[in-house]
Amino acid sequence: VSIRVGVNGFGRIGRNFWRAVAASGKDIEIVAVNDLTDNATLAHLLKYDSILGRLPYEVKATSDEITVDGKAIKVFAERDPGKLPWGDLGVDVVVESTGLFTDATKAKVHAENGAKKVIISAPAKNEDVTIVMGVNEKSYDPSSHTIISNASCTTNCLAPMAKVLHDTFTIEKGLMTTIHAYTQDQNLQDGPHKDLRRARAAALNVVPTSTGAAKAIGLVLPELKGKLDGFAMRVPIPTGSATDLTVDVSREVTVEEVNAAVKAAAEGPLKGILSYTEDEIVSSDIVTDPASCIFDAGLTKVIGNQVKVVGWYDNEWGYSNRLADLIQLVGRDL
């Protein structure tokens, strides 16, 4: 039986998630979407995508549905998520991807309306648990975890690398920088924004800004709580990012040891989440790669017990694939 999913917010992540489910063949059925945009526009943006290209299916919009390849998705335009009839639609899991309801005290309205589980596609507040697939999914408890955060795309890239380094060499402390594609939260032209750096034209600047990814690591790897920090440099590309992590470990190591540890994890317990390459790639090469982290072995640097590693990630596509994986995980025990 398919896991029935409702999506609240059909923006970049909502639409990427729809495409990731369609491409993966996972037993997930998206039965309803809520978005304040009109249906014709939503259908058009699902069919035509500047990064992912054109959907090879017929996409039609009616007043209350979008039909893709003959399959209907119910569409609502409710400003108040408390009015969404998830229970009546038999929705098992709601993906909360508006960016507006990242506080579980607000997101729980989906569960009150009949959804069995709610997954917030962002770092959250007051959530029951934050899960990064491949890192701490074993801590998921179906009996007590209803509102679940899938963390951020950057935490999903950072955590697998940090886990391997910590499990193998013991991280003492570290700093990270994500060289990150621009997002909807930046301005196309200079204009007002609460973050004066993000106020500036996204396609014309390297824009330093905050990321909670390093601090959030403690939510999924508790032994690293308070040991990592960092920031983001937003760069003028639409997707395809890289996390640069520098850590002090408990003993002196070599580049070969570090790369061997990551390669073993990528071919073993973290297969599909962490991938390993020795190719000399650039950001466009990892667009539409479903892994959370593509470890670039050629960039590993070591001085004594200090280690620098780099992992690439398609911040939209990789993350959307993890949403689908997390839904499969929670769908086992509904």
PLM region spans:
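C-terminal active-site/capping subdomain that shapes the small-molecule cofactor and substrate pocket
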Residues: 230, 242, 246-334
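Short clusters of hydrophobic/aromatic residues that line enzyme substrate/ligand-binding pockets
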Residues: 66, 131-133, 147, 188-189, ...
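Acidic, glycine-rich segments within the central catalytic cores of soluble metabolic enzymes
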Residues: 167, 171-238
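Short, solvent-exposed beta-strand edge segments and adjacent coil->beta transition regions
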Residues: 144-145, 201-203, 240-244, 306-308
